[in-house]
Curated annotation (Swiss-Prot):
Pfam families (alphabetical): Semialdhyde_dh, Semialdhyde_dhC_1
UniProt function note: Catalyzes the NADPH-dependent reduction of N-acetyl-5-glutamyl phosphate to yield N-acetyl-L-glutamate 5-semialdehyde.
PANTHER family found in the cross-reference section: N-ACETYL-GAMMA-GLUTAMYL-PHOSPHATE REDUCTASE, CHLOROPLASTIC-RELATED, N-ACETYL-GAMMA-GLUTAMYL-PHOSPHATE REDUCTASE, CHLOROPLASTIC-RELATED-RELATED
EC number: 1.2.1.38
SUPFAM superfamilies, alphabetized: Glyceraldehyde-3-phosphate dehydrogenase-like, C-terminal domain, NAD(P)-binding Rossmann-fold domains
Pathway membership: Amino-acid biosynthesis; L-arginine biosynthesis; N(2)-acetyl-L-ornithine from L-glutamate: step 3/4
Chaperone is among the record's keywords: no
Protein's UniProt name: N-acetyl-gamma-glutamyl-phosphate reductase
Keyword terms of this UniProt record: Amino-acid biosynthesis, Arginine biosynthesis, Cytoplasm, NADP, Oxidoreductase
Subcellular location: Cytoplasm
Amino acid sequence: MSQPTVYIDGDQGTTGLLIHERLRGRIDLQLVTLPDAERKDPVRRAEAINAADIAILCLPDAAAREAVGFIRNPAVRVIDASSAHRTQPDWVYGFPEMANGHAQTIAHARRVTNPGCYPTGAIALLRPLQQAGLLPRDYPVSIHAVSGYSGGGRAAVDAFESGDASQAKPLQVYGLALAHKHVPEIQLHAGLTNRPMFVPAYGAYRQGIVLTVPIELRLLPAGVTGEQLHACLAHHYADARHVDVTPLADTQAITHLDPQALNGTNDMRLGVFVNAEHGQVLLSAVFDNLGKGASGAAVQNLDLMLGAADVAKAA
């Protein structure tokens, strides 16, 4: 049986480079690349996409839509790392752990849209609680997240790493118009009736995300406790290879969250911090924006689509 072929369209961007690095040396697939002079040639790109078993799109949204339009071969399967198709009903959302059986849905999908980095953490925290009836669909969700500057893409990396480090701003809060492009994605896949309030920021470090969601217990169904929220998440992710829920007893000793703690991995760590006296809970997610938030998730989805679970586990 011949090896499946994988073509990365946009393999010189931040995510594309990391996916290429993760796949380099794999003996269970053939990684197709174009010469430098042909990487932006639409004719050669279209040929490579249509000749691949799976094409991974690491492109800006408009270019990703264009690349999908190149497809004439009905056998080609696609993983899109852009945000172009994340709310489209005919694309499978590429977060394997978000629902029971969803990994199998991805495994058999023709079109998979890779989650955004921030939505990965927000949906991981909110969706299981909403599905269990512990978090009302109309809860006024507020999300804050800090990412390493690599979340801004190649231009942001160059700006931080090629200039005078002393001029780098320690923290840049953005999305102040409350219209970040990830909001519809979070709302849809977390099962929320209303748009969540989302305030992101970039820190003066390369990669890693810490995302938090404050919860007022008085706004939840009567009798719901922080312990129940934790139990729900712990149960949902009990068998997940790449998502871990910190034991409730351990959170009492945690005084800070390090956004860089899981850098270089495809893992995500969730936490539930409970203040029963004040009726408040803080949900948290820590993960690598370039790992579980991008390239790691894409490779995880690729392995599911290839039926290469053993290879994924070994990696």
